[in-house]
């Protein structure tokens, strides 16, 4: 099973053109893309790991593979 840090996921999203749309006082961040439909929601601290269904959900929302 692949394990990846939240910070690495965010770096990959930004490199692909996604930008931070919402980040309030919660641990959830929402990213939007200028041409792709939908939003990508990422929860957790930057140092947290993501794997399994959470990573699959982020891949589905963004169209990226990690």
Residue ranges and their predicted role:
Residues 1-23, 27, 31-66:
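Basic nucleic-acid-binding interfaces
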